[in-house]
Structures are given as C-alpha cells and as structure tokens.
Amino acid sequence: MKPVIALVGRPNVGKSTLFNRLTRSRDALVADLPGLTRDRHYGEGRVGERPYLVVDTGGFEPVAKDGILHQMARQTRQAVEEADVVVFIVDGRNGLAPQDKSIADYLRKTGRPIFLVVNKAEGMKYTAVATDFYELGLGDPRAISAAHGDGVTDMINEALEVAYAGQPEEADDDDPSRGIKIAIVGRPNVGKSTLVNALIGEDRVIAFDMPGTTRDSIYVDFERNGKKYTLIDTAGLRRRGKVFEAIEKFSVVKTLQSISDANVVILLLDAQQDISDQDAHIAGFVVEQGRALVIGVNKWDGLDDHARDRAKADLTRKLKFLDFAKSHYISAAKKTGIGALMRSVDDAYAAAMAKLPTPKLTRALIEAVEFQQPRRRGPVRPKLRYAHQGGQNPPLIVIHGNALDAVTDTYKRYLENRFRETFSLTGTPLRIEFRSSNNPYADKG
C-alpha cells in the first residue's frame, strides 16, 4: 500500500502550504467538480514512480492545564501513530515555541520516524534557522520554504526512503485467486461490519489473514454467485467466532490506504444521519484516486416516506459531484438491497476497466461536436479532431485538436456525459485530457 506521511505542527507554521505543494499534482483533477469542497486534509503526492498519501493533522494549541494530549484530537493521535513517517513542522521565523516542545515530547513516544522540518527558512542561513531546534532532540532539522519550494524535494525524498523501507512487499494484483478488490468505507456506526457479514456469510470465507499489527490490512477472499472478490478491511473489523465485529475506531489512514488499494469502493452512509463533511471528504478522495464507486445508504428500513425523501435530497445536494455513481438504499441487517449493490460493483469495475477503441471514441466525439459545438473564446473556436484512450481505472480519454485551451469546463462536462452515455461508463470517474497542436504535423511520427 502507499505509505502515509503525517504533517504535524502547531497552528500557522505552514502545514497547509506544504500540504498544497506536496499534493498539487492531484488538486487539478477535482478542482472543477461542482459541490466538492476544497477544504481537504488528506491527498496524494508522487515523486517519480513513488506515490504516497499525505495527512494534514491540523494545528495543535496546547494549554497548560490540559496538556498536549488533551488538545490533540483522537483522530490526530491515531493518524500520527499509524503513519509511516511524521513530518514535524516548526516556524523558522518565530523560533522555538513552548508548544513545539510539547509536541516533540509526544512524538518521541509514538515510535514513528520523525523528520524535523524548519519552515519559512527562505533567505536565512541554516545555522541561524536550525540552532534553536536542536533542543527538541529530534536530530538535524531540515530547512525548507513550503511557499517557495526550497528544500521540499530533498526533504520528501528522504522521507520516502524511510517510508518505503518499512513497506511490506506488494501483493500480486494479477493473482488469479484474487477477485475484484472492494473497500467498504464510511464513518463509525454506519454498519460496515454488518454489511461485511451480509456479503460474506459465515460459510463463505475462503481465507482470513489476521494482521500482525494494527497498521496492517486484512484481506478477505470470498465468492458470491460464483464470482470472486477480495475485501480490503481497514475499518477495524475483527473476527469473533464465525462473524465479524467492528472495533469502532474510524481511521483516516486506514481509509485512505484502502481506497488507494481498491478496484471498487463502497461508500456506506447512514440513512438516519445527515451527510457530514467527513463523508464528503472521503468521497472526494475516492474521486481524486480515480476509483470506481458505489454508494450504499444503509438502515433504509428504519425510515418513513418523508424521511426517505429528505435523505435522498440530502444525498443529491451534498454529494452531487458523485452523480456518476449508483446509489442503493439498503438494510445490511436485513440483507435487503445487497444483490443490487453487488451488481453495481461489478458494473462499476467493468466500466473502470473498459477498453474504448479509437474509431468509436472519435465517432462519439464527432457526433457530440455536431450536436453541440464548443463556444468561441474571442475569435477562436476550439477544433476537436479525434480521441483515443490514454488509460484505464479510471478511463482516460485524450482528445486532440486545435486551440483546446479555450474549451470551457461546462463543455468538458458535456463531453464527459456524452462519453458516459455512449460507452455505459457508470460508476467510474472519467478523465478527459486535451492536447492542442497548431502544427498540423505535431501529432504525427
């Protein structure tokens, strides 16, 4: 699985700036999705062929009477303890603060590899920046400027060397004994463990690997209606007797890793609770990772007609950027709606892995343009000439032509909807990439 790097520090030391710099390559993928909040605390970065997950743990502002452990949210502590590397950020301009010492004392006890990073060091000599922070006892400080990018690449490369060294050997994704990899994600108490038992059943478990530590994943291989699946369990599920129970401990780190490792994600919501920012953040990460998605709205049997209408309206309003995914209203406890949910899992996986022939893509593009041409931008009208597939999981459609920088987001969504309709691409994000050339020979040879 992708290693996790946790960003830690008191408020206003530049964690968000560093987070944005580390994840900037991913932001553009979801920035134009209507309804998706940009206020995220986790994302993906990549250095060469090495991807990693980043968690911004928020700011710590300890007060004397409570101490640092009381000020740190449970989720923050858990994220730090489960991360592969902790990047502890301090402020080079303002120097060492009492809060820094409190945080350092806590971090030393976690046993995690810690990188002490002095931010806002632009224009300052290293000795002047670093001297005070040796007092924290966390080794040599690394001076960076998150705002300007100075020193960031070297720092993250060092962190990844440590993070990847601790990663177990990757399982073979092409192993024929493994079926579609499914991650069931959601807040605590939405019914994840109940859904697992409804899917697997007491006699359907083929293999169960008990983790060596709480930071490992559990893979459960099972069959349903003659099809093979692999459940990636990062929700704290443990087997008790012949069934699974949930240790109700929501883990951001485990959720991110399970989404990254999955072929299809089931986002489980509680019909009896309003959709939260946490639900939307998880959903946004699924889209950012390009994972196929099915939405399960659980505990549907407990609602009257009025409450059901309200729940559907809440889903449409708050998660409208997931309009490509099918929603199923289920009761995991009563095992109603599970069959249809799993059929959508199969369909979403098929759509994510679909092969789209160039002639058919180009024909669909031409028909879309003939039905509705892109708007002019000044004297220029974009010319969309042909399309081909650039990747799978999620499908990537590359469109070639002239002046494609002038294509609006609205027209891009129009094309996406046309491609979805033509090729039945339900349940998967779809990427469209434009490649302009004013040189008629640029796309040849």
Swiss-Prot record:
<dbReference type="InterPro" id="IPR027417">
    <property type="entry name" value="P-loop_NTPase"/>
</dbReference>
<protein>
    <recommendedName>
        <fullName>GTPase Der</fullName>
    </recommendedName>
</protein>
<keyword id="KW-0677">Repeat</keyword>
<dbReference type="InterPro" id="IPR032859">
    <property type="entry name" value="KH_dom-like"/>
</dbReference>
<feature type="domain" description="EngA-type G 2">
    <location>
        <begin position="180"/>
        <end position="353"/>
    </location>
</feature>
<dbReference type="GO" id="GO:0043022">
    <property type="term" value="F:ribosome binding"/>
</dbReference>
<feature type="binding site">
    <location>
        <begin position="186"/>
        <end position="193"/>
    </location>
    <ligand>
        <name>GTP 2</name>
    </ligand>
</feature>
<feature type="binding site">
    <location>
        <begin position="56"/>
        <end position="60"/>
    </location>
    <ligand>
        <name>GTP 1</name>
    </ligand>
</feature>
<feature type="binding site">
    <location>
        <begin position="119"/>
        <end position="122"/>
    </location>
    <ligand>
        <name>GTP 1</name>
    </ligand>
</feature>
<dbReference type="InterPro" id="IPR016484">
    <property type="entry name" value="GTPase_Der"/>
</dbReference>
<dbReference type="InterPro" id="IPR031166">
    <property type="entry name" value="G_ENGA"/>
</dbReference>
<dbReference type="InterPro" id="IPR006073">
    <property type="entry name" value="GTP-bd"/>
</dbReference>
<dbReference type="InterPro" id="IPR003593">
    <property type="entry name" value="AAA+_ATPase"/>
</dbReference>
<dbReference type="InterPro" id="IPR015946">
    <property type="entry name" value="KH_dom-like_a/b"/>
</dbReference>
<feature type="domain" description="KH-like">
    <location>
        <begin position="354"/>
        <end position="438"/>
    </location>
</feature>
<feature type="binding site">
    <location>
        <begin position="298"/>
        <end position="301"/>
    </location>
    <ligand>
        <name>GTP 2</name>
    </ligand>
</feature>
<feature type="binding site">
    <location>
        <begin position="9"/>
        <end position="16"/>
    </location>
    <ligand>
        <name>GTP 1</name>
    </ligand>
</feature>
<keyword id="KW-0690">Ribosome biogenesis</keyword>
<dbReference type="Pfam" id="PF01926">
    <property type="entry name" value="MMR_HSR1"/>
</dbReference>
<comment type="similarity">
    <text>Belongs to the TRAFAC class TrmE-Era-EngA-EngB-Septin-like GTPase superfamily. EngA (Der) GTPase family.</text>
</comment>
<dbReference type="Pfam" id="PF14714">
    <property type="entry name" value="KH_dom-like"/>
</dbReference>
<keyword id="KW-0547">Nucleotide-binding</keyword>
<keyword id="KW-0342">GTP-binding</keyword>
<dbReference type="GO" id="GO:0016887">
    <property type="term" value="F:ATP hydrolysis activity"/>
</dbReference>
<feature type="domain" description="EngA-type G 1">
    <location>
        <begin position="3"/>
        <end position="167"/>
    </location>
</feature>
<dbReference type="GO" id="GO:0042254">
    <property type="term" value="P:ribosome biogenesis"/>
</dbReference>
<comment type="subunit">
    <text>Associates with the 50S ribosomal subunit.</text>
</comment>
<comment type="function">
    <text>GTPase that plays an essential role in the late steps of ribosome biogenesis.</text>
</comment>
<feature type="binding site">
    <location>
        <begin position="233"/>
        <end position="237"/>
    </location>
    <ligand>
        <name>GTP 2</name>
    </ligand>
</feature>
<dbReference type="GO" id="GO:0005525">
    <property type="term" value="F:GTP binding"/>
</dbReference>
<dbReference type="InterPro" id="IPR005225">
    <property type="entry name" value="Small_GTP-bd"/>
</dbReference>
